[in-house]
Design a protein with these regions (language model features):
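A structural signal for short, hydrophobic/glycine-enriched beta-strand patches
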Residues: 1-109, 114, 118
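A transmembrane-helix-recognition feature enriched in membrane-embedded lipid enzymes
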Residues: 118-132
Length: 132
């Protein structure tokens, strides 16, 4: 099997490194042979990830693909990849987040983690509806 990693250099992050480069480093650190990793490092959003990955998957005759991304991002990624490629994707969500609310009244106080979660969720909702 081969692994396709997709993601370009995001303007608000370190421009020298792409998301795909970071994924390659992670996978090789885990022991995945570098010659089994296929790189797409030009895309800047999920729609472009799907479009630019299409050529890689088509040349290899892929019919069924595991789509690995964060749990929060999976709905949007799956919709866009299925729309662009029209092949079967099996969703493999990572980094599920589960947290218990603190007891008592403290749970009603403002919290930076909650604000970050709201920001990430809003980004996914907007991205999902914009990508339709």
């Amino acid at each position: 099997p081969e692994i396709v990693v997709s993601g370009g250099a995001l303007p608000w992050r370190d421009a020298a490194a792409t998301e795909a480069d970071a994924a390659v480093r992670f996978l090789t650190d885990l022991g995945v042979p570098a010659n089994r990793i296929l790189l797409e490092s030009a895309s800047l959003d999920t729609q472009q990830n799907a479009q630019m990955t299409e050529a890689i998957l088509r040349t290899r005759g892929a019919r069924k693909v595991l789509l690995v991304t964060s749990a929060l991002h999976m709905r949007r990624a799956l919709a866009q990849f299925e729309q662009v490629l029209g092949i079967e994707f099996i969703p493999v969500a990572t980094d599920h987040e589960v947290a218990a609310d603190p007891p008592g009244l403290i749970r009603w106080l403002p919290d930076t983690d909650a604000l970050d979660g709201s920001r990430r969720a809003l980004k996914e909702y907007l991205g999902y509806w914009a990508g339709r």
